[in-house]
Structure formats: structure tokens, C-alpha cells
């Protein structure tokens, strides 16, 4: 009886393919923490690591009594045991599935689990496949994060088991699925209609939206009425959104989409809502070197130019005044509805130091401050409120030329001046230093009437004439032709530096601060006076003689 049973067992083994790598069916007879015991009808039961029976979530996929396919690793491993592998059996099954899918052009399910040069790796039931980057979608996809880790459908486009080479395409699946849907969409699509779609890709200039077999471009300028730096501020890959068809080129199958067009245009009649001079609050959305943008309502931004940020510092960087996100008060300066531009002012909502100065200072008032800078045309003095006043070169000294007088001053010096003029609108304050003292020129002219004989000292002379110092800070000019009664063509022949000169004050040019002198006119006047004196004396003598003769005649002498 025993011999016949052993004989029958040996014969049954012959019927089983026992070469290494063969696939046999077994029954799960026991499950332990680390191993699963499988009876495949061989000489002994085999212990297979439990890990080989777990799914991706780490859960056992079998229970006692289940039939499973396993691969023969070895019939006897030297200890009389048979080694089986569930992992190799699953891999064998996976290849069979792939071959069938490849031959029948069916889809397979897999997961994108890595990135390699030129594409991605996909796990297909334990088989590693290659997905070229160009076959991920019908359009180039830069970011695949929204696809990784998800179960997706693929088509096998190349299969070589010997070389363990599998190439798949997701694009082929999408094109196949979209074909019927695409035809229907293209037939019904019209400009102006609202459609739903899935954001599938973002670029710097917009987003591509899958409308169902047809991709449309949602340009960045059509995402929102407000300023958008990058599409990711408005939409993300995978978002389902409603958009409006703006343009549809049926022949080239190009669709332009709009998101902002779903709402009303906030720029319509904006000038009526915000007349020039209106003060309102807004949020700083962006900073540039030339200013900052402030959103005054949803979809409407205005520019505060750097020159409109601060009353006193025209070149201050915007980041020193405001930060992105700040809520600020601004004034509407100008609106160009056609160009969709609004000019806003920040400083106009603060006290104007120029206006304040104009209201608190009059012409002639004395002010003091530190010299902030010295330029080719004058001295800038710092005043209250952070503003500057200018002392022009011509207002530094009565007596010394501005270019020379300015050398007596340096940056940081405390200096006093007189207010000459205030133009708050043009933000200009004119100051004078020389006006702190009386004008010697005007004083001299007031004390000396035209025609008076004056004296002075020659300080400079050339052929054309001589400069004569009449008083401290007051000079007159004596032309060569006026230097003598005699004809003089070269003043140096009759005058020298240091000579005391007595001349007639013949004229004044207040604008150019020039006094005209004449020795000739003085001499002529002297001569005329002398003649008049002589004539007067002669007349007196004649009169006296005549009276004497008459007296004698009366006496009868």
C-alpha cells in the first residue's frame, strides 16, 4: 500500500513542471507574521516571505485557503525544501498582462513614481516602464506634481521582455478619450459662451485649460482686471474653472479664454466714481524703482509715482515709504480711462510743508538753518518741515561777486537769511544773505543826488575807462572820454590806480547797479561857475561905478 502511494506521488510530480522559473498553483495553508506557508503539491510545503503578499498599502492580499500562483525558485535547496516566490509569479503575470494589452491596444494602469532624463518612470504592477516627457500629455507639461502618485491609464507602445524594456504613453490615452468629446465640443463651441475646464499647465504668459479634448489659452492679461505677475496668483494646475470663450479659430483649432470677462469691467465710468482730488484708502500691491501700485478696489490699481510720495525727497525709494500689503491713504490725481491708468498721490494726504511755510512766513522775515548743499548757482539751506530754501549766488553779498563770496561757506554751516519769495505751488523758496544788511548802493544813491560832485579813488583802469570806489561796496565808472576836458582816447594816460578823483555824478542804472561819473562834466561845470562868478563881479563893479558917476553929477561936480 505504501509503495503504491509513493509511486502515485512520484507520478503526480512528473505532471508538474518543476524547472526553476515555472509557475505553479498552490494553496495558502498558514499565515505567520513574517511568512506565508504555501502547499504547491510538491514534496514539501514552502515558506514565502509575507512581504510578497502585501499590496502597496502594506496589507496582506490573501487568507488561509486561497489559491495563488507562485514561481519555482528551486525544487530542493540542499536541505530538501522547495523554494517558491510569489513576487516572481506576480511579475510573470504582469508581463502577460502587458503583452496582451500591447497586442490588443488596451490600456494599463500605472503610477508615475520618478523622474529620469527625457521623461518619467511608471510602475505597472511591479514592472518599471519609461514614459517619455513628450508623451505625458497632448501639450508639453513642465510640472507633473499633480500627476505623480496617482493611478493613471497608459498605452504600451513598446515592449521587450528580454531586455526588460517597456515604453508607455499617456498622451495616446488622452487623445483616444478626447476624440469623440473633442468633435462634439468643436461643433458647439462659440465665441462668448461660458465653458468649464481643468487647468492643465501654467506658463509665464498664461494657463492652458482643458475644455474636454480641446485646450484653450487663458492669457495672463485676461485672468483678472487687476495687475497679475504670474498665473499662479489666480489659478493652479488641476483647478476646475469657468471661463468665457473670447476668440475661436475653428480652422486652426485655437481657443482664447477669459476669466476676468465673467465679471463687470471695474474701469467703466471710474472717473465718475473717483473725481480728481478724491481721497481714499487702498492696499499696496507692488513696488518698483519708479513708484508703487495701490489697489483702490477689486481689479483697479493706480500708480503712486516716486515724485508723489514725499514732499521733500523726490528721489526716495518706494521701499523706504511703504511695503507691499500696507493700507494707505491716497489722492486721485488723474485718470486716463482709455489707457486704464490712474495717477495717485501719497504726499497729498499729508501736510504740505511748502504751504505751511508760505502761511507762516512773509517776505523779509529772517530764517536760520544749516547749509545742506552748495551748487554752481547757490546755497541750499535746510528749513523747518524738511524743506530747502535757495540763496542764489547774486544774493550772497552786496560787494563781492557770488562765485567768490560762496567760497566763504561750507556744508553744515549755520546760516541766517532773509525770505525774498515763496512759491508753494512750485515748491520754491528764495532766500538772501546780503539782504540782512542795508544795500550800500541804494544808500549812496539816496545820499547823493544826480549832478552832485563826488570824490573817490581809482581801483582799476584800462584804455576804455576807470573804476572808482566811491564808498565801501559802491563803485562808479569813469569812461575815458569823460576823464578830462581834453580829448582822451586812453584813460591810462591820465589816470592811475590810487588816484583821488573828483567827478560829477551823471547817472545811475539801478538794475545793473552802475553809477556814471564824469570829470569833464565836473570841469565844465566848474568853468561855467567861475565865468558866472567873474561876470557877476564885473556887473557889480559896473553898477558901483555907475552909481558913483550919478552921485557926482547930482552934486554938480
UniProtKB/Swiss-Prot annotation:
It holds the Pfam family S1. Residues 21-87, 105-171, 192-260, 277-347, 364-434, 451-520 form the S1 motif domain. GO terms for molecular function: mRNA binding; RNA binding; single-stranded RNA binding; structural constituent of ribosome. Its main location: cytoplasm. One of its GO terms (biological process) is ribosomal small subunit assembly. One of its GO terms (cellular component) is membrane. It is found in: Cytoplasm. InterPro entries: NA-bd_OB-fold, Ribos_protein_bS1-like, Ribosomal_bS1, Ribosomal_protein_S1-like, S1_domain. Keywords: Acetylation, Chaperone, Cytoplasm, Phosphoprotein, Repeat, Repressor, Ribonucleoprotein, Ribosomal protein, RNA-binding. Changing residue 139 to A/K: Loss of RNAylation by T4 ADP-ribosyltransferase ModB. Coiled coil: none annotated. RNA binds at residues 139, 142. Phosphorylated; probably on a serine. (Microbial infection) ADP-ribosylated and RNAylated (about 30% of the modifications) by phage T4 ADP-ribosyltransferase ModB. This results in covalent RNA-S1 conjugates and allows the phage to reprogram the host's gene-expression system. Disulfide bonds: none annotated. Disruption phenotype: Essential, it cannot be deleted. Upon depletion cell growth and total protein synthesis become linear. Changing residue 205 to A: Decreased binding of Q beta-derived M-site RNA, 80% synthesis of (-) strand RNA, in construct expressing residues 1-273. Changing residue 208 to A: Decreased binding of Q beta-derived M-site RNA, 50% synthesis of (-) strand RNA, in construct expressing residues 1-273. Induction: Represses its own translation via the N-terminus (at protein level). The modification N6-acetyllysine is found at residues 229, 279, 363. Required for translation of most natural mRNAs except for leaderless mRNA. Binds mRNA upstream of the Shine-Dalgarno (SD) sequence and helps it bind to the 30S ribosomal subunit; acts as an RNA chaperone to unfold structured mRNA on the ribosome but is not essential for mRNAs with strong SDs and little 5'-UTR structure, thus it may help fine-tune which mRNAs that are translated. Unwinds dsRNA by binding to transiently formed ssRNA regions; binds about 10 nucleotides. Has a preference for polypyrimidine tracts. Negatively autoregulates its own translation. It is not clear if it plays a role in trans-translation (a process which rescues stalled ribosomes). Evidence for its role; binds to tmRNA with very high affinity, is required for binding of tmRNA to 30S subunit. Thought to play a role only in translation of the tmRNA in vitro. Evidence against its role; overexpression of whole protein or various S1 fragments inhibits translation, they have no effect on trans-translation, and an in vitro system with S1-less ribosomes performs trans-translation. Part of the 30S ribosomal subunit; the largest protein subunit, it is loosely associated and not always found in ribosomal crystal structures. Does not bind rRNA. Probably requires ribosomal protein uS2 to associate with the 30S subunit. Binds in the junction of the head, platform and main body of the 30S subunit; the N-terminus penetrates the 30S subunit while the C-terminus faces ribosomal protein uS2. Nascent polypeptide chains cross-link this protein in situ. Can be cross-linked to mRNA in the ribosome. NCBIfam families: PRK06299.1-1, PRK06299.1-2, PRK06299.1-4, rpsA. The 6 S1 motif domains are not equivalent; the first 2 no longer bind rRNA but instead are involved in protein-ribosome and protein-protein interactions. Binds to the 30S ribosomal subunit via its N-terminal fragment (190 residues, the first 2 S1 motifs) and allows translation by S1-free ribosomes. The same fragment represses its own translation. The first 3 S1 motifs do however bind to mRNA pseudoknots in the 5'-UTR of at least 1 mRNA (rpsO); deletion of S1 motifs 1-3 but not motifs 4-6 is not viable, although a deletion of motifs 4-6 grows slowly and is cold-sensitive. Belongs to the bacterial ribosomal protein bS1 family. This is Small ribosomal subunit protein bS1. It comes from Escherichia coli (strain K12).
Amino acid at each position: 500500500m505504501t509503495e503504491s502511494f509513493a509511486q502515485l506521488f512520484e507520478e503526480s510530480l512528473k505532471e508538474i513542471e518543476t524547472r526553476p522559473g515555472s509557475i505553479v498553483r498552490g494553496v495558502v495553508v498558514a499565515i505567520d507574521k513574517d511568512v506565508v506557508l504555501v502547499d504547491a503539491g510538491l514534496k514539501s510545503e514552502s515558506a514565502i516571505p509575507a512581504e510578497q503578499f502585501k499590496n502597496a498599502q502594506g496589507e496582506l492580499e490573501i487568507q488561509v485557503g486561497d489559491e495563488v500562483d507562485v514561481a519555482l525558485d528551486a525544487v530542493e535547496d540542499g536541505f530538501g525544501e522547495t523554494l517558491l516566490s510569489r513576487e516572481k509569479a506576480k511579475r510573470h503575470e504582469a508581463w502577460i498582462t502587458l503583452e496582451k494589452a500591447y497586442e490588443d491596444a488596451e490600456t494599463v494602469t500605472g503610477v508615475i513614481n520618478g523622474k529620469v532624463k527625457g521623461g518619467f518612470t511608471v510602475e505597472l504592477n511591479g514592472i518599471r516602464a519609461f514614459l517619455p516627457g513628450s508623451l505625458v500629455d497632448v501639450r508639453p507639461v513642465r510640472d507633473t506634481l499633480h500627476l505623480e502618485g496617482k493611478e493613471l491609464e497608459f498605452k504600451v507602445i513598446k515592449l521587450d521582455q528580454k531586455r526588460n524594456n517597456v515604453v508607455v504613453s499617456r498622451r495616446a490615452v488622452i487623445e483616444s478619450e478626447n476624440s469623440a468629446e473633442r468633435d462634439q465640443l468643436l461643433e458647439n463651441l462659440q465665441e462668448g459662451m461660458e465653458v468649464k475646464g481643468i487647468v492643465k499647465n501654467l506658463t509665464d504668459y498664461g494657463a492652458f485649460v482643458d475644455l474636454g479634448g480641446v485646450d484653450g489659452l487663458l492669457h495672463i492679461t485676461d485672468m483678472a482686471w487687476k495687475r497679475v505677475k504670474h498665473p499662479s496668483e489666480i489659478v493652479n494646475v488641476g483647478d476646475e474653472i469657468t471661463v468665457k470663450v473670447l476668440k475661436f479659430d475653428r480652422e486652426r483649432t485655437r481657443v482664447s479664454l477669459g476669466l476676468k470677462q465673467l465679471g463687470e469691467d471695474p474701469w467703466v465710468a471710474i472717473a465718475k466714481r473717483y473725481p480728481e482730488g478724491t481721497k481714499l484708502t487702498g492696499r499696496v500691491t507692488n513696488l518698483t524703482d519708479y513708484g508703487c501700485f495701490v489697489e483702490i478696489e477689486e481689479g483697479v490699481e493706480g500708480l503712486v509715482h516716486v515724485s508723489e510720495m514725499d514732499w521733500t525727497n523726490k528721489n526716495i525709494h518706494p521701499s523706504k515709504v511703504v511695503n507691499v500689503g500696507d493700507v494707505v491713504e491716497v489722492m486721485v490725481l488723474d485718470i486716463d480711462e482709455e489707457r486704464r491708468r490712474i495717477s495717485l498721490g501719497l504726499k497729498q494726504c499729508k501736510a504740505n510743508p511748502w504751504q505751511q511755510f508760505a502761511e507762516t512766513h512773509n517776505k523779509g522775515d529772517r530764517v536760520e538753518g544749516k547749509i545742506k548743499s552748495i551748487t554752481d548757482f547757490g546755497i541750499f539751506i535746510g528749513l523747518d518741515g524738511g524743506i530747502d530754501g535757495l540763496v542764489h549766488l547774486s544774493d550772497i553779498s552786496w560787494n563781492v561777486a557770488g562765485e567768490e563770496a560762496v567760497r566763504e561757506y561750507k556744508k553744515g554751516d549755520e546760516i541766517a537769511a532773509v525770505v525774498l519769495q515763496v512759491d508753494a505751488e512750485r515748491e520754491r523758496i528764495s532766500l538772501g544773505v546780503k539782504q540782512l544788511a542795508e544795500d550800500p548802493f541804494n544808500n549812496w544813491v539816496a545820499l547823493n543826488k544826480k549832478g552832485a560832485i563826488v570824490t573817490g579813488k581809482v581801483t582799476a583802469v584800462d584804455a576804455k575807462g576807470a573804476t572808482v570806489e566811491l564808498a565801501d561796496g559802491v563803485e562808479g565808472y569813469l569812461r575815458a572820454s569823460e576823464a578830462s576836458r581834453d580829448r582822451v582816447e586812453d584813460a591810462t594816460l591820465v589816470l592811475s590806480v590810487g588816484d583821488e578823483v573828483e567827478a560829477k555824478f551823471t547817472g545811475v542804472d539801478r538794475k545793473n547797479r552802475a553809477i556814471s561819473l564824469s570829470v569833464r562834466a565836473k570841469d565844465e561845470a566848474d568853468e561855467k561857475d567861475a565865468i558866472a562868478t567873474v561876470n557877476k563881479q564885473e556887473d557889480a563893479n559896473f553898477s558901483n561905478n555907475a552909481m558913483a558917476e550919478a552921485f557926482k553929477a547930482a552934486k554938480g561936480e
